[in-house]
Regions:
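Mobile active-site "lid"/loop adjacent to the S-adenosyl-L-methionine
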Residues: 88-118
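S-adenosyl-L-methionine
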Residues: 48-92
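Helix-to-beta-strand junctions that scaffold the AdoMet/dcAdoMet cofactor pocket
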Residues: 123-125
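Conserved SAM-binding motif I beta-strand of class I
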Residues: 39-44
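C-terminal catalytic and target-recognition region of SAM-dependent MTase-like enzymes
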Residues: 114, 128-190
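SAM-dependent Rossmann-like transferase core, predominantly class I methyltransferases
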Residues: 1-16
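Conserved SAM-binding loop of SAM-dependent methyltransferases across substrates and taxa
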Residues: 25-38
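Conserved class I S-adenosyl-L-methionine
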Residues: 14-24
Length: 190
């Protein structure tokens, strides 16, 4: 699944600084720490979720000094990091559902493009963006186009190294293609 991918990439590419946006209970934070990352900054707007994330870091035996948890708005934080000149080796964007149906797709596309554009600007050359959508109203092809456009607007080029979908515990039935709502791209910046 995607957390295992994070740990694998971290081990192989020796990430030092990771930014986990919309971290919820810290699944990607813990995976990055398992992969040997130096420090993870995790952002979510839910205090209770951040408390669980910090507890998960502790339950996995990691030193809390290797993490920073921010109870904040992700968009505002990305803009703030940009104005501060912060750079990260890897960034995870795993937002909540922006488009529950196709009728919300246009608004959601703008939101996905904005967070991806901001993230690309914070990504170090050779860094990796793990970007996800769980919106049924956004197709995998549209999501690819959104991310590509965000990179272009940020002045960043890269390679899609993997396309990700649901884990084995999220099967899709033959007669319900809308069930393919989980999608992700792993993009390595040039």
């Amino acid at each position: 699944d995607s957390r295992k991918k994070m740990a694998d990439y971290t081990r192989r590419l020796k990430f030092d600084q990771v930014l986990n946006c919309f971290c919820y209970t810290g699944g990607f934070t813990v995976a990055a720490l398992h992969g040997g990352v130096g420090h993870v900054t995790s952002i979510d707007s839910s205090g209770p979720a951040l408390e669980k994330a910090a507890a998960n870091v502790a339950l996995n035996g990691f030193d809390a000094s290797r993490t920073t948890f921010m109870d904040a708005d992700v968009n505002a934080s990305l803009r703030q990091f940009g104005s501060q000149g912060r750079v990260f080796d890897a960034i995870v964007l795993d937002p909540p559902k922006f488009a529950p149906t196709i009728t919300h797709a246009e608004r959601a596309a703008r939101a996905y493009k904005d967070i991806n554009r901001l993230a690309f600007k914070l990504l170090a050359p050779g860094g990796v963006l793990f970007t996800y959508s769980c919106s049924g109203g956004i197709s995998p092809d549209l999501f690819h186009k959104i991310v590509a456009s965000a990179g272009s607007d940020a002045g960043v080029d890269g390679f899609i190294t993997e396309r990700l979908g649901g884990a084995p515990d999220h099967p899709m039935t033959l007669n319900f293609p809308e069930g393919e709502y989980l999608k992700g791209l792993v993009v390595m910046r040039k």
